[in-house]
Amino acid sequence: MLHSITMKTLTYKFIILLFSLLCYTLNSNAYNLRQINNKDGLSNSSILSVGQDENHLMLFGTCDGLNIFDGKDIQIFRSTPSNQAIKGNFIEKIITTQPGTYWIRTNSGLNKMNSQKGEFLFFPEFAGHNFIFTDCQHDLFIYDGIGNLQIFNEKTKQFQSVLIHKSEPIPLSDILDIKFDSQNRLWVYVKNEMYYCFSLYNKNTNQPYIELHEVKHFNKNITKAFADGDYEFIVDQDDILYMISSEAPQITHIADISWLTHQKGDISSIIKYKEDLFISFQTEGVVKLTLTPEKKEPYSIIDLQIHCGVLSMMKDKSQNIVWIGTDGQGVYKYTEEEYTLNSYLFSQ
């Protein structure tokens, strides 16, 4: 009789333990996707760009104007004959610099908008493909279509050229990505087996310039490059994904993602979320690479089941949220369920 009771108790404990482990496993991978589309007030459900300002307002660049989202309501800025605050309705890129200042590249050119100050500037010469980015002091730079690096001068309200020392200008068609890291070094990733590091000098003078600091060699041609802070994610000619940290310049092999690109098409963006990675595709959704160091394969793959192309993606600046801009389904807000471990006290 005692043996039977003991076995029942042990069996009960084992079942509870298995149930607890199952709940932990399920919840550790649980996530929520909230969709925001034209039913919620978006002017258009194709999201070309995503940004966020210092007040944590979300900025969605659509095919029909800029949409500013405060978590509840959406305010729309679009170009109309009676309102030329923003020229052009295809919002291709959004960058925030000074408080309240938005830089918006559209199909018509580059707009500077500060609605609080009533300041609206327009630079039609920067329409088309170019690279727009900021340094650690939030000053705006642009690498234009003819290979010129320029910085916006807040005093003159004009762009001025940044000279390039110890290097020839790099053709825009060869560049995959440009960024400043947290040490204000300028990194340029190109299509061949090299990437460059420049230092910036005399920024606040009439003759700013960059000087080539280092040329780094990669063992294969680079085909894609995506910046996320001090991390750069590069994809080589064989669709192998690597991560480079500018803090401790070393190349980390992530995974062979060739089967993903064959299945889902070209990559549109890559971002780091905690220790995991999000990869979006121009024709078919987003996958999450979850770090699993205890397994043979360091990353497991979760498909977020977004069945359309993804044009833009960013990590929230203050919360554990990923904002996903799609081609036709609006914006998805990704959040994770916090899992809890319950403790049980067993008595015999």
Tell what function each PLM region has.
Residues 1-348:
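Carboxylate-rich, polar loop motifs that coordinate divalent cations or form catalytic acidic clusters
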